[in-house]
Amino acid sequence: IGHYSGLIHFGREVMGNKNTPVYAMPKMTKFIKSNGPWSQLVKLKNIKIKSLKNDKKVKLNKRISITPFLVPHRDEFSETVGFKVEGPSKSLIYIPDIDKWQKWDNDLIKIVEENDYSLIDGTFAEQDELPGRDMSKIPHPFIVETMDILKPMKEKSKVHFIHLNHTN
């Protein structure tokens, strides 16, 4: 279930928002504007699309900025991104979805060490979590794999697993 599905709650049937900023990469912007019910949110001005570009910092206000960066994932309808969130004195890395760390052209340990907090994909704990399912069809790094990669790190308390599913 794509993360974008929750946007429908901004529409007139639920919240009835007005010009709520929605930050989106190019392919997601096109998808939202071209497909209902999301296109209705744009038409009725429930949401206002704000464009994002890979590795381009966006200031949300005087104190907080975000930088989206592409990560390898299924990308059926749009790009998949993580975010670096920066405040006046702290930074956070947010990667809720990624296929496998080995497919990414970055060093996970280095990224985690460069930030104060890391919120990373914890969708599945291990290979056998969904008996009878081909886990390659729903790719995510297993928590045990991520813990193994991060084993050499000294400060592990800055890592928090998110995007948990109903089985873990």
Residue ranges and their predicted role:
Residues 22-24, 93-94, 161:
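Structural beta-sheet core signal
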